[in-house]
Regions:
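Hydrophobic alpha-helical hairpins/lids featuring a short glycine-rich hinge
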Residues: 3-38, 46
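Hydrophobic core segments of alpha-helical transmembrane domains in multi-pass membrane transport
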Residues: 28-29, 106-117, 142-154, 170-178, ...
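Transmembrane helical segments that form the transport core of multi-pass membrane transport proteins
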Residues: 152, 156-285
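Short amphipathic alpha-helical coupling elements at transmembrane boundaries
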Residues: 5-15, 50-53, 210, 242-247
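Juxtamembrane and boundary regions of transmembrane helices in multi-pass small-molecule transporters
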Residues: 56-60, 76-77, 86-87, 93-140, ...
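Hydrophobic alpha-helical transmembrane segments
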Residues: 18-26, 63-64, 98-103, 139-146, ...
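Membrane-interfacial helix-loop connectors
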Residues: 28-69, 73, 82-102, 230-318
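Flexible loop linkers connecting adjacent transmembrane helices
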Residues: 1-14, 127, 316-322
Length: 347
């Protein structure tokens, strides 16, 4: 219940909507590189909805801010988005080279957030009094999650092993921790483990019930998209597209267009298609297409998994049209981030 604790903490602080706007956006931006943009956007939008008291004038800019922050935060980390993960595992951009995208990502989020801030109502929601504490083992599981990400990076960087092996190693440690936590619900272990009366009332922890919550339909969607793109490559269409785009327009213009296409088609199939085309580009251009594909999905609510997920959290106020109204502001941040990319990356 880590995010229930976060929600309780925000409610107790008695922050106004303007401060909550920045708090939820900043937390999303910092969480996204570790937990990925979809997870961070979904969880933080739930938190924002909880503290909104149903105020639509706060929900719309806050949700858009969360989507932009999630995609921007995920663009500079190998684990922040499926697109960055694909670029990283293909060897186009190395682990530490993603840091070049940190400043462009910050600009991509800060500019639209700074403009939307003036439309956030200057009100204070009713403060909550509920007290939520971490469940037993919560802090250890948080540590294991961070350790798993570090292990996957280390396996790939130093041992030249596939990143999934580091992830599976971390999952194994989580299973062992889950076995230990199951004993909290068994009375015969209460005295041996020195549990208090409050701790004894916690339900049994079962890792398999958590795994059941994985969205396998999303995984099947990815399999279908990647198979379709592979078929286009096989029959030669990707080669024609690559020649017409990168051959005629040049790498920079083409990579900027890729970001716009990501907002319309979804960034994952677009990035996979670029990787299948494998145009001759230097590090600076691979960083650009990684940035544009990642943050370009923020232009429309359907352009990224984060945006689609957030639309499902609150359909009454936040939808395709309410997001579209702010597209020019988001586009301003998109173009500014490209300008910063030009200044900070080696050419």
């Amino acid at each position: 219940n880590v995010f229930k604790v976060l929600r309780s903490w925000l409610l107790k602080k008695g922050l106004g909507f303007k401060k909550l706007f920045w708090a939820t956006g900043a937390i999303t931006f910092m969480l996204s590189p570790i937990a990925d943009n979809l997870t961070s956007a979904l969880l933080m939008s739930t938190v924002a909805l909880s503290v909104s008291n149903g105020n639509g004038r706060f929900i719309v800019p806050a949700f858009i801010n969360i989507v932009v922050a999630a995609n921007a935060g995920g663009a500079w980390s190998p684990f922040g988005d499926i697109t960055t993960l694909m670029v990283w595992t293909s060897g186009k951009v190395q682990t530490m080279e993603f840091s070049y995208l940190l400043l462009p990502s910050i600009v991509n989020w800060i500019i639209p957030a700074s403009i939307m801030y003036f439309w956030v109502p200057d009100e204070t929601p009713e403060a909550g009094n509920e007290g939520v504490e971490f469940k037993p083992g919560a802090k250890v599981i948080i540590g294991l999650g961070i350790f798993t990400v570090a292990t996957a990076v280390s396996f790939h960087q130093f041992l030249h092993l596939p990143p999934f092996m580091g992830m599976m190693f971390g999952l194994g440690l989580l299973m062992m921790m889950g076995f230990y936590l199951k004993r909290w619900g068994e009375k015969k272990h209460h005295e041996k483990m020195g549990l208090t009366e409050d701790q004894r009332n916690h339900p049994r922890f079962d890792i398999f019930t958590k795994v059941e919550g994985v969205e396998f339909d999303t995984l099947l969607f990815f399999f279908g998209v990647l198979t379709a793109v592979g078929a286009l490559q096989y029959i030669g269409y990707l080669a024609l597209i690559s020649e017409s785009m990168y051959g005629n327009l040049g790498a920079t213009t083409s990579n900027i267009i890729v970001g716009v296409l990501s907002a319309i088609v979804d960034n994952i199939p677009v990035m996979y298609a670029v990787l299948k085309m494998s145009p001759e580009m230097g590090l600076d251009q691979w960083l650009l297409v990684t940035l544009t594909a990642g943050v370009g999905g923020s232009l429309l609510s359907v352009g990224s998994a984060a945006g689609v997920a957030v639309m499902g959290v609150e359909r009454k106020n936040y939808n395709f049209m309410s997001h579209l109204k702010w597209a020019p502001v988001i586009a301003l941040g998109y173009m500014a981030s490209i300008g910063v990319w030009y200044l900070v990356t080696p050419h």
